[in-house]
Amino acid sequence: MVTVEEYKSEKIFGYMKQIDTAVKLLNIPLIKNIVRRKLTEKLEKHSGDFIVALPEDVDILINSAEIVAIGPRMCYHLYKKDLSYAIFLDELAKALIQIGYAKEISKEDAIIVMKEGKKRGRLQLISNVSGKPLELCNQSRKTCSLWKLEKAGFKIIAGKCTSKANI
């Protein structure tokens, strides 16, 4: 699982670049089986870290957070053409505010951002960071590293969260 410290130190961007490169390498016949095996090994430790969010789960998580922040999705670092925002909660929000990647917003505004993303057809995911649901993302399937893994046959995104937000 990825940690708050890996977000704060910006190591997360390196991981995302590696994923993007590996998915591209899957198109090369000579090495695709090796890449698939290595990628499968690395992704096993992230099983269950990414969950499709239901609107009621988003509301519960945001309303139960002590601090809420907004910033560009992590995938935006790779794909600058599709700016949409993620909501960060609690210690992840604090860490990303501290490094200038995110800014604090009200819970009400965070809920509006997520509802607007849903209206625009965004895939909304909850990411467990340091073992807690701390990132709510408005994914675009075209520019989402996790969705690209799914499309390549890796089951990295779990099913829907429960309506009680018991993640």
What are these regions (language model features)?
Residues 94-129, 136-140:
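Compact structured core domains
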Residues 125-131, 152-167:
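Ferredoxin-like iron-sulfur electron-transfer modules
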Residues 58-64, 116, 128-130:
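A general structural signal for short secondary-structure junctions and capping/turn motifs
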Residues 79-80, 134-136, 145-148:
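Short acidic/glycine-rich loop or secondary-structure boundary segments that cap or lie
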Residues 1-91:
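General detector of N-terminal leader/presequence modules that precede the first folded domain
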Residues 55-57, 122-125, 151:
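Glycine-rich, charged/polar anion/phosphate-binding loops
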Residues 135-144, 162-167:
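Cysteine-centered iron-sulfur cluster-binding motifs in ferredoxin-type domains/subunits
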